[in-house]
A protein has these predicted regions:
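Ribokinase/PfkB-type carbohydrate-kinase core domain
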Residues: 2-127, 131, 138-141, 153-173, ...
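Charged C-terminal helix
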Residues: 7-10, 245-289, 497
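Glycine/charged-rich beta-loop-alpha catalytic/anionic-binding loops adjacent to active sites
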Residues: 20-25, 190-203
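Conserved N-terminal beta1-alpha1 strand-loop-helix module at the mouth
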Residues: 20-38, 43-49, 56, 289-375, ...
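Conserved phosphate/ATP/ADP-binding segment of small-molecule kinases
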Residues: 108-193, 340-415
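Short glycine/threonine-rich catalytic loop with a Thr-x-Gly-x-Asp
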Residues: 200-217, 233-234, 259, 456-457
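Conserved post-catalytic alpha-helical subdomain immediately downstream of the catalytic base
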Residues: 216-268, 470, 479
Length: 501
C-alpha cells in the first residue's frame, strides 16, 4: 500500500483502447506518394484521416481536428505558404502540429523550410529519421560545429551515432518532443529519453512506413490529454513507437520478407494489436544521457533551515540557472513527512516540469510513484534495485556506490546511473562516509562500472573540474547552490564549467 495515494486502484493501461474509442480526427497535409497508405493506416489504428490541400478547406476542418500532420515530402513553394497558414489555424484552435521534415538532410531548400516552420514556435512534435533530426539540430545549434560528423544517406537517411543525445538536445532547443527513427528509435520530450526497437528491417524497404508513422504519432498525440497525469509525453510516445514496431514484426511473421505482401499484413497488424500485447512485450527502455546529469542539484528543507518557501525559491532559481537534474532529498530532524512531504514534492515537481529539469526523489520510492517523478535515487541500505525497478517501471533509477566492494555486490543491471562519493569532506550529510576522492570514479570504471556517474560530496566550483576529469558526466551539489547568496549565479558557474569540457 502506498501511503501517499488514497485510491490504491492501479490505473488501467489502455492506450490503444482509448485511441480507438476516441477516434481522433487527423488532418494530413502529406506526401502525394503516401496518401492512401497513410489513410489506411490511420483507419486501421482507429483514427479518422482526412487529407486537406487548401486553406479554405482547412478552415472548415480544423475545428474538429485532434491533430494536424505536416509532411513536406512533395515540396513546392506554394505548399510552403499553405503549411504556414495551416500552422496559424491549428495554433488558433489549439490543435497539436506534428512536423515530418522529409529529406531535410538531403537539400538546403528543404532544410530552410523546416527551420522556418520550427521557428514559428508552434510545432508540437518533430518526427524524422535520425539523419533528418541531426540536420535540424546541426542547423539550429551554435555548439555543434563538427563538419566531419556522419551525414544521412539519401532521403531515407542512416543510423546516426549519439541520436539519443541529439534528440534530447533538440527537444530542449525547440521546446517540443522529438522522435528520431533508425535501427533503434529514440524519443525525448526534453526531460526524459526513451529507446524503442524500430521493428523489422524490411520496413525501410517499403515506401511510406516512415510517413505513416508521422500520421500515427499525430493520432496518439491527439489523445495524450487522457494520459498526461500518469505518463510523461516521452514515455507515452515511446509506447506509440513500440506499437508501430510490434506491428512491423507481426506483419513479417505473416507475409515473410516480401515488401509487397508486407504492406497489407502491416495494416492488418496495426488493426489487430491490442494493449495486452503492447504491455507484455515491454519494448520501452529508459535512457539516461550525460547532459541530463551535468549539473545535479540535491536539496530539501534540512538545507534551508526547514523553510519550505525558501526551498521552493532556491529550486526555481536553480532551474532558471540551468540545472539539468534536481533530487528532492528530505532527511533529518524536523523535516517533512506524510501529507506535508507529498504536497511539497508536488510543488517541486511542477517547478521542474516547467523548466524541463529531470526530477528525482531520494530514497522514497512510494513518493516517486505518487507524484509521478522522473526517477528515484536509492542508497546501499535502501530497497534492493530489482524491487525498485519493478515498482517504478521506466522511471530513472539511481544508486549510490562508495567502493569497489559495493560495486561488486550491487546489481547495476536495474540502475540507470550512479552517484559516487563523497568526493570531498561534506557537512551536508552528517552520516557521510570518509571522502574517497575523484579517483574513486576511475577505479570503479576500471572494475567494470559502465553506467553514467555523478560525483557528490563537498563539491564546489573550485574542485568540480577534477571530478569531471576523473570520468564523471556531472556533479551533484548541495551546499554550493543551496547556501549560495545567489543560487542562479552559482548554477551558471557550474554550467559553464561543465560545458567547457
Amino acid at each position: 500500500m502506498n501511503p501517499y495515494i488514497h485510491n490504491q486502484i492501479k490505473p488501467e493501461f489502455n492506450i490503444l483502447y482509448t485511441l480507438r474509442k476516441k477516434n481522433p480526427l487527423v488532418i494530413c497535409i502529406t506526401n502525394d506518394v503516401v496518401r492512401t497508405f497513410s489513410a489506411n493506416g490511420l483507419l486501421a489504428i482507429g483514427a479518422s484521416p482526412i487529407m486537406s490541400e487548401c486553406s479554405e478547406d482547412l478552415k472548415d476542418l480544423i475545428v474538429y481536428a485532434s491533430a494536424l500532420l505536416i509532411n513536406i515530402g512533395t515540396l513546392t513553394p506554394e505548399k510552403v505558404g499553405y503549411y504556414k497558414e495551416a500552422i496559424k489555424l491549428a495554433k488558433e484552435y489549439d490543435v497539436p502540429i506534428i512536423l515530418d521534415p522529409v529529406g531535410c538532410h538531403a537539400g538546403a531548400y528543404r532544410l530552410s523550410v523546416v527551420l522556418d516552420l520550427i521557428k514559428t514556435g508552434s510545432i508540437s512534435l518533430l518526427r524524422g529519421n535520425q539523419s533528418e533530426v541531426k540536420a535540424v539540430y546541426d542547423a539550429l545549434s551554435s555548439d555543434n560545429k563538427d563538419e566531419n560528423s556522419p551525414l544521412g544517406k539519401g532521403v531515407d537517411g542512416a543510423q546516426v551515432a549519439d541520436s539519443a543525445i541529439i534528440a534530447y538536445r533538440l527537444a530542449r532547443l525547440i521546446n517540443c518532443p522529438v522522435v528520431a527513427t533508425g535501427e533503434e528509435d529514440y524519443v525525448s520530450d526534453g526531460t526524459r529519453v526513451f529507446a524503442v526497437p524500430h521493428g523489422h528491417s524490411i520496413m525501410t524497404a517499403v515506401t511510406g512506413t516512415g510517413c505513416l508513422l508521422g500520421a500515427v504519432l499525430a493520432a496518439f498525440f491527439g489523445i495524450y490529454d487522457s494520459f498526461k497525469d500518469s505518463l510523461s509525453t516521452g514515455e507515452f510516445l515511446a509506447y506509440a513507437l513500440a506499437y508501430y514496431g510490434l506491428a512491423g514484426e507481426s506483419a513479417v511473421k505473416v507475409s515473410g520478407i516480401k515488401p509487397g505482401s508486407f504492406s497489407v499484413a502491416f495494416i492488418d497488424a496495426l488493426y489487430t494489436l491490442d494493449d495486452e500485447v503492447l504491455v507484455s512485450e515491454n519494448r520501452v527502455q529508459s535512457v539516461v544521457v550525460p547532459d541530463q546529469l551535468q549539473v545535479y542539484f540535491v536539496c530539501g528543507t534540512q538545507d534551508t533551515e526547514l523553510n519550505k518557501k525558501r526551498l521552493l525559491e532556491i529550486v526555481e532559481d536553480a532551474c532558471r540557472g540551468g540545472i539539468t537534474c534536481f533530487q528532492f532529498r528530505e532527511k533529518g530532524d524536523g523535516t517533512l513527512e506524510g501529507q506535508q512531504k507529498l504536497e511539497l514534492a508536488q510543488q517541486l515537481q511542477h517547478i521542474c516540469a516547467k523548466y524541463h529539469v529531470l526530477y528525482i526523489i531520494n530514497d522514497d520510492v512510494e513518493l516517486a510513484v505518487a507524484v509521478n517523478a522522473d526517477g528515484v535515487h536509492v542508497g546501499q541500505d535502501d530497497m534492493c534495485l530489482e524491487d525498485v525497478r519493478n515498482i517504478v517501471g521506466h522511471k530513472v533509477v539511481g544508486i549510490s556506490i562508495h567502493s569497489i566492494e559495493e560495486l561488486h555486490k550491487t546489481d547495476v543491471l536495474y540502475a540507470d546511473c550512479v552517484g559516487v562519493g563523497p568526493m570531498y569532506t561534506t557537512s551536508s550529510k552528517p552520516d557521510a562516509q570518509e571522502p574517497c576522492g575523484p579517483e574513486r570514479i576511475a577505479e570503479l570504471q576500471a572494475q567494470g562500472l559502465n553506467l553514467l556517474c555523478v560525483g557528490i560530496g563537498g563539491i564546489t566550483i573550485d574542485n568540480a573540474m577534477a571530478v569531471l576529469r576523473a570520468g564523471a558526466c556531472g556533479v551533484a551539489v548541495i551546499s554550493a547552490i543551496a547556501h549560495a547568496e545567489k543560487p542562479y549565479e552559482a548554477v551558471r558557474q557550474f554550467k559553464e564549467l561543465a560545458s567547457s569540457l
